[in-house]
């Protein structure tokens, strides 16, 4: 089974070797026919404490590291400025 990869924004880096990543997804509501935004927070392992609040990162699923951590930070994605 392939590992899931998600992209989100770091909203907290207060814990040692852990960041909280907010992942937002958009989908069309089947009845209302409008775009709905849904978000979820994931706790991800950051071994080197290199990611800060506001960074856009990619996280990948992994074996459980602790009670709440099931994800590892892969890379930081570059922000595209318009």
Curated annotation (Swiss-Prot):
Gene Ontology annotations for the cellular component aspect, listed alphabetically: cytosolic small ribosomal subunit
Molecular-function GO terms, alphabetical: rRNA binding; structural constituent of ribosome
One GO BP: translation
Keyword field: Ribonucleoprotein, Ribosomal protein, RNA-binding, rRNA-binding
Summary of subunit composition and partner proteins: Part of the 30S ribosomal subunit.
Known role: One of the primary rRNA binding proteins, it binds specifically to the 5'-end of 16S ribosomal RNA.
Protein name per the record: Small ribosomal subunit protein uS17
Organism from which the protein derives: Paracoccus denitrificans (strain Pd 1222)
